[in-house]
Amino acid sequence: MNEKQRLEQTGQIKTESHPADRKSALDRLKEKTTKDYEKYFTSVFLPPNLKEAKKRGKEEVKYVKDFSIPEEFRGMGRGRKFYIRTYGCQMNEHDTEVMAGIFMALGYEPTDRPEEANVILLNTCAIRENAENKVFGELGYLKPLKTTNPDLLLGVCGCMSQEESVVKKILKQYQYVDLIFGTHNIHRLPYILHEAYMSKEMVVEVWSKEGDVVENLPKVRKGKIKAWVNIMYGCDKFCTYCIVPYTRGKERSRRPEDIIQEVRQLAAQGYKEITLLGQNVNAYGKDFTDIQYGLGDLMDELRKIDIARIRFTTSHPRDFDDRLIEVLAKRGNLVEHIHLPVQSGSTEILKMMGRKYTREEYLELVRKIKAAIPDVALTTDIIVGFPNETDEQFEETLSLYREVEFDSAYTFIYSPREGTPAANMKDNVPMEVKKERLKRLNDLVQEIAAKKMKQYEGQVVEVLVEGESKTNPDVLAGYTRKNKLVHFVGPKSLIGQLVNVRITQAKTWTLTGELVNEAIEVNEHGKIYAG
C-alpha cells in the first residue's frame, strides 16, 4: 500500500479538541459505530485485524526504490532525542536500525537514557506471552516519565502492535501511549510522528495486510563488524502455534540485485560478517513470478563477494532444498552453521503443529546436509508441552535430539498465542509436567553441547573478534564460523579482525584459548588465509 492508496482507503479526517475535553480512544470507540469511528481521531485509526491478516492478497507486491524523507519533515527532530528499546529476534533488531536511521534523517539525536528522550519507542516481540508481559511492565515503568513530561511521545511498534488484543489492552489500560504502529509501515514513521505531534489523540496505524517492499531506507547499524540484511519479509507457513504470519504478513522477497548491492556496499565499508534475515528465509524467491531464483542461487552469488562470512536465519525444514545444500557445501565465506528448527521429534505433534514434515523427513534432510557438509554445526528450536503431547511423544523428541546431536537448542514451554489455531486446542498437559520435560530436555542439550565443545580443545579456530568480554575488560571475545563464543587475551587493536586462536579449555557454552598469530585477512578472491 503506497501513500496515495492509504489516504484513498482511509478518507482521513482531522478534528481538533481541547485537552480538557479529551476522551480516550476506547471511549470514543464505545460511543460510535464501527462505520463512522475514523473521524473521531485526529489521525486515521487503523487497528489490526487477525482475520484480515490471514488473507493472502493476489495483488502484486510493489517495490518502492525511491524512499526519501519529505522536505516538510526535515528538521522535525532538531533539538530532540529518541530512545528505542528492542525486544525479540534479529528482524526486530534490524527494524530498529531502520527506525534509528529515519530518526536521525529527521534531525533527532540518539540517547541511551529514556529520561532524556523526547520520543521513546518500544519495538516489541509477540512470539511468547512472557515477551509481551515484559513490554507491558516497561509501559508501566515509563508512566512517571510521561506524567512529568507531557510532551514526551511514547510509542509501541513491532509485532505486538499487529495483535488485536494488544491494541485493545493499550487503548484501555495504557491511555498515555501516544502512538502505535506495526511492522508493515515503518517507512511511514515521519508521517506517524507528525500526526502524533499535531494530534490530541492516540495515533494508531497498523496495517493488517502487508505493505510494499521499500528499498533505500536509512539505517544506523549497530557496530561496524557484523550486519543484518533483510532478504524477505513475512511467512506463509501458518504453523498452528505461531503468530508470526499474522504479525509479519505474507512472504515478500526483495529483488536479488538490491540484496547483492547492499552486501557489496557493506563489504566496501569493511564489515566482516553479514546475516541474511527472513521469518522463513529459505522460502526466498518463491513469490517471484518473472524469474526462477531461490536462496541457493542468491547464496551462490553472494559467496563471490569479498566479505569474510555469510550466515542466514531462520530456515524452515520444508523449504530446505538440494540446491541450497549444494551451494553451502562450496563453503568459502558461507559458514558451516545452520539453524534448523525442528520443534518436536514426534510426527503426530508435528502434524498438530502444522509443520508439514514428518520426523523421518527431517532426519533425512539432516543426513543430506551432513553428507555434503560433514562438520556442520546444527542448532534448533524445540517446544515442549504442546497441547496433548504425551510422554511417549516427548521421548521421541529426546531420541531425535540424541540422533542429530545438535550443537545447541533454544527450548521453550508452549505458550498459547491468541488468534492461532493451537490456542483453541484443549491443553491437557499440566504445567508441572511441562516444566519437568523442559528440564529433561535442557539437561540433554547441555550434555551434548559439553561433549561437542570438548572436541575443540587443542584445535585452532578462526575467531571474528567483536569486543571485550562482558565479564573481564582485559579479555577479548569473538565467535567462530560455527558461532561458538571464544575468549582470549589480546590487544584491543584486534577488535573487528579475524584471528586464529588455539583452544585450551572448553566449557558448555564458551571456549577459552590463546592467540596463535596476527589477524587473518581476506584476499580479493574471498579466500581466507592466516597472516
From Swiss-Prot:
Which reaction(s) are listed as its catalytic activity?
N(6)-dimethylallyladenosine(37) in tRNA + (sulfur carrier)-SH + AH2 + 2 S-adenosyl-L-methionine = 2-methylsulfanyl-N(6)-dimethylallyladenosine(37) in tRNA + (sulfur carrier)-H + 5'-deoxyadenosine + L-methionine + A + S-adenosyl-L-homocysteine + 2 H(+)
So what does this one do?
A: Catalyzes the methylthiolation of N6-(dimethylallyl)adenosine (i(6)A), leading to the formation of 2-methylthio-N6-(dimethylallyl)adenosine (ms(2)i(6)A) at position 37 in tRNAs that read codons beginning with uridine.
Q: What class of enzyme is it?
A: transferase
What does the similarity note say? Belongs to the methylthiotransferase family. MiaB subfamily.
- Assembly notes: Monomer.
Residues the record lists as binding [4Fe-4S] cluster 1: 89, 125, 159
Looking at the record, which segments are called Disordered? 1-26
User: Which subcellular locations apply to this protein?
Assistant: Cytoplasm
Key words, A-Z: 4Fe-4S, Cytoplasm, Iron, Iron-sulfur, Metal-binding, S-adenosyl-L-methionine, Transferase, tRNA processing
Which positions in this protein are listed as binding [4Fe-4S] cluster 2?
Answer: 235, 239, 242
Provide GO CC annotations from the record: cytosol
What protein name does the entry list?
A: tRNA-2-methylthio-N(6)-dimethylallyladenosine synthase
Q: Which organism is it from?
A: Geobacillus kaustophilus (strain HTA426)
Which stretches make up the MTTase N-terminal domain? 80-198
